[in-house]
């Protein structure tokens, strides 16, 4: 479709957003308002109608999925095979800048980007080196806390020496010492973490005017998608490139700012005009996704936030069904209700893949997983272990990194996979490498055999495998061929076969397929690197999206945050309980509470056709260490905009044959036969003692610690006195 045809399809606000190119433009894009169409049409318009060279346009977003989708749409519109990828994530663009100009701040171009597992290993090693003593309790959470603190320091541009100098407590000083050791390890291994990518570019631009001007002059137009998610550092990079020009468009929705815990600042999009005083603001307020009923309840709810920019979203979509709010008497009955309702929906013509089950925290999915499995409803858990984070894939990637980038972290991992080499030998290799100022790969493949003869005398064949693989890399051999050679000749693949690790072998085969596609599609003009393997490793390091829902017929279970940017025909938002959604942390902070409210708004606006909200009343929660109460957000929903279903027997759930057949079926006849202290037995949970009675609910402490304390209805047919 031509650009002219696309412009004809836009509404007035969308058209204004595309055609305004002489002033900075802030587009406030309501949920489902077609922002991706607007931003891609604007890029195509700049290329086709303003004759701007595609490589002189920079468009940045926050996920590889979004960048890929935008790139594909622009290519479809323009039929343009441009020279280099100009649509990318912030991190990918920063990586490109550093590959080209990082040498001006002492960075080698073939640096390694480490992942979260590497970070944890470095922290563990730094902790050992520091001799800092931790209690058993602190050890459990130390990794998470220190990495969060390091991220915070980096975003505030605080280096390790400043962190040590400004430490005000023993804990903070310990964190700062670990930070210094962590950063030293990165420098020694020519490695960067994700935060470093942006920090190094910031420092490069700050310190070197010539390089800054080079990159400023590289672009005639800059566009930023999901602008509400930007942090101060990212906004600084945008300002570096655009502060002296009018050629900037930012797109975002303040009502969907749900990543403040990652550093996103709501004020940046709200106060855009303070930085760009001549900017114009355009609101996209027509929703193309949801029914009027879903949109009305979403609009009504988000108005409870005080710190926001008012906008009234409307739709011309056909009217749909009323939103349903369902009260359940336990987490089990909530899961049973949802699964029974899913079966009804499928009978009505929906597919399983048309349905999302959303929750605020991952722990809430457990009951749904059990119940869906029991009812033989196919489902997938989104945001579980990603393909690239599976151990076998990380092992394979370590082989590739060792023979190309030669980083010590990957070399240590590979050596640890070889049966003939133990931890003591690896330590000797590391120490010898440090003494001789060599990396591990160069040491073990060194022609001077005296360096390591006593340590690696049984590894001559393996060392030859590494040397041959390194030469294959230098010859730019297909990556699939290099990896197959490494995994077969090293004995790694055979080890998986002997152990009958079928899943791992299937994952390796999937990786071979991925490498084959990359080899076939590789074109150096799309990369800042001519070597296939290096280009692949660079691209893979920057791929960090949450697992996407596979295009197969399964119900998807995912957190509200993972659902951002997605949509589906039917959405269940579950666990609307105080302390769960909103989370406990929001109880002492207005800003946190407003962010939780925005998170629910995001969840509400994922639904296209039907929306169900569920909560539990009276059940005991181990998460909360108390009875579950309805979320305060339920009281903020307009009662005229939803249909309420109680936990009692006149609900749809009671009429479900599936539910009547379950061991949790509650008979209509009431039984008030229990007293505190009674010994009882449940057909599924075993024996226990009644510790509290609330109306017709029993709080039972079960002997089996796996179940602990649970709320069970007095008339539950699976329960009896003993």
From Swiss-Prot:
The UvrD-like helicase C-terminal domain sits at: 292-565
Residues binding ATP are: 32-37, 289
Matches recorded under CDD domains: DEXQc_UvrD, SF1_C_UvrD
In this chain the UvrD-like helicase ATP-binding domain maps to 8-291
Q: Which SUPFAM superfamilies match?
A: P-loop containing nucleoside triphosphate hydrolases (SSF52540)
Gene Ontology cellular component terms for the protein in this record = cytosol; DNA helicase complex
Q: Which GO terms describe its biological process?
A: DNA replication; recombinational repair
Q: What PROSITE patterns does the database record attribute to this sequence? A: UVRD_HELICASE_ATP_BIND, UVRD_HELICASE_CTER
Catalysed reactions, semicolon-separated: Couples ATP hydrolysis with the unwinding of duplex DNA by translocating in the 3'-5' direction; ATP + H2O = ADP + phosphate + H(+)
> GO molecular function of the protein, one example?
DNA binding
Q: What is its EC number?
A: 5.6.2.4
Q: Which UniProt keywords apply?
A: ATP-binding, DNA damage, DNA repair, DNA replication, DNA-binding, Helicase, Hydrolase, Isomerase, Nucleotide-binding
User: What's its job?
Assistant: Has both ATPase and helicase activities. Unwinds DNA duplexes with 3' to 5' polarity with respect to the bound strand and initiates unwinding most effectively when a single-stranded region is present. Involved in the post-incision events of nucleotide excision repair and methyl-directed mismatch repair.
Q: What family is it from? A: Belongs to the helicase family. UvrD subfamily.
Any idea what this protein is called? Answer: Probable DNA helicase II homolog
Species per Swiss-Prot/TrEMBL record: Mycoplasma capricolum subsp. capricolum (strain California kid / ATCC 27343 / NCTC 10154)
């Amino acid at each position: 479709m031509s650009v002219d045809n696309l412009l004809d399809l836009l509404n007035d606000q969308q058209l204004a957003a595309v055609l305004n190119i002489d002033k900075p433009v802030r587009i406030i894009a309501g949920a489902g308002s077609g922002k991706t169409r607007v931003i891609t049409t604007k890029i195509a318009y700049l290329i086709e109608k303003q004759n701007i060279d595609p490589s002189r346009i920079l468009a940045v977003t926050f996920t590889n999925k979004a960048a890929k989708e935008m790139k594909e749409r622009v290519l479809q519109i323009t039929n343009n095979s441009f020279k280099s990828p100009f649509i990318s994530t912030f991190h990918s663009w920063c990586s490109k800048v550093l590959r080209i100009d990082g040498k001006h701040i002492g960075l080698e171009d073939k640096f390694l980007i480490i992942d979260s597992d590497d970070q944890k290993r470095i922290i563990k090693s730094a902790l050992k080196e520091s001799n800092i003593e931790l209690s058993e309790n602190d050890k459990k959470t130390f990794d998470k806390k220190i990495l969060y603190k390091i991220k915070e320091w980096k975003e505030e541009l605080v280096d390790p020496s400043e962190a040590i100098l400004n430490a005000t407590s023993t804990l903070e000083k310990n964190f700062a010492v670990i930070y210094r050791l962590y950063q030293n390890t990165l420098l020694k291994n020519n490695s960067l973490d994700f935060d470093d990518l942006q920090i190094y570019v910031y420092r490069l631009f700050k310190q070197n005017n010539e390089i800054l001007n080079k990159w400023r002059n590289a672009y005639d137009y800059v566009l930023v998608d999901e602008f509400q998610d930007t942090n101060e550092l990212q906004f600084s990079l945008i300002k570096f490139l655009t502060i002296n020009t009018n050629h900037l468009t930012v797109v975002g929705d303040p009502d969907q700012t749900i990543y403040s815990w990652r550093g996103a600042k709501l004020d940046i999009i709200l106060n855009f005009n303070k930085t760009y005083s001549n900017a114009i603001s355009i609101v996209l307020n027509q929703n193309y996704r949801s029914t009027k009923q879903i949109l009305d309840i979403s609009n009504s709810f988000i108005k409870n936030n005080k710190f926001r920019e008012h906008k009234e979203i409307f739709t011309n979509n056909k009217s749909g069904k009323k939103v349903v709010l369902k009260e359940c008497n336990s987490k089990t009955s909530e899961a049973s209700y949802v699964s029974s309702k899913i079966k009804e929906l499928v009978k009505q013509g929906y597919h399983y893949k048309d349905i999302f089950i959303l929750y605020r925290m991952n722990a809430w999915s457990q009951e749904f997983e059990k119940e869906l499995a029991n009812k033989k409803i196919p489902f997938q858990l989104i945001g579980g272990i990603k393909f690239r984070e599976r151990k076998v894939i990380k092992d394979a990637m370590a082989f590739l990194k060792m023979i190309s980038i030669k980083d010590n972290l990957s070399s240590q991992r590979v050596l640890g996979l070889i049966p003939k080499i133990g931890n003591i030998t690896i330590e000797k290799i590391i120490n010898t490498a440090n003494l001789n100022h060599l990396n591990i790969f160069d040491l073990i493949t060194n022609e001077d055999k005296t360096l390591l003869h006593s340590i690696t005398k049984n590894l001559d064949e393996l060392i030859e495998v590494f040397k041959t693989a390194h030469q294959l890399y230098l010859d730019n051999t297909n990556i699939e061929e290099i990896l197959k050679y490494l995994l077969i000749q090293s004995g790694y693949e055979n080890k998986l076969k002997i152990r009958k690790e079928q899943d791992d072998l299937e994952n390796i085969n999937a990786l071979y397929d991925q490498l084959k596609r990359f080899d076939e599609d590789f074109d150096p003009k799309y990369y800042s690197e001519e070597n296939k393997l290096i280009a692949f490793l660079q691209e893979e390091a920057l791929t960090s999206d949450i697992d996407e829902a596979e295009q197969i017929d399964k119900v998807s279970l995912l957190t509200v945050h993972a659902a951002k940017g997605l949509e589906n025909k039917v959405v269940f938002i579950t666990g609307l309980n105080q302390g769960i959604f909103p989370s406990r942390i929001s109880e002492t902070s207005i800003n946190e509470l407003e962010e939780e409210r925005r998170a629910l708004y995001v969840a509400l606006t994922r639904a296209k056709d039907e929306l169900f909200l569920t909560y539990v009343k009276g059940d005991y929660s181990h998460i909360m260490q108390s009875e579950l109460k309805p979320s305060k957000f339920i009281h903020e929903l307009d009662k005229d905009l939803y249909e309420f279903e109680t936990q009692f027997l006149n609900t749809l759930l009671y009429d479900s044959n599936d539910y009547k057949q379950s061991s949790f079926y509650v008979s209509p006849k009431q039984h008030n036969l229990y007293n505190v202290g009674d010994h009882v037995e449940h057909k599924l949970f075993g024996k226990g003692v009644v510790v509290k009675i609330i109306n017709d609910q029993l709080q039972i402490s079960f002997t089996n610690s796996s179940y602990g304390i649970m709320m069970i209805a007095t008339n539950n047919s699976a329960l009896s006195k003993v």
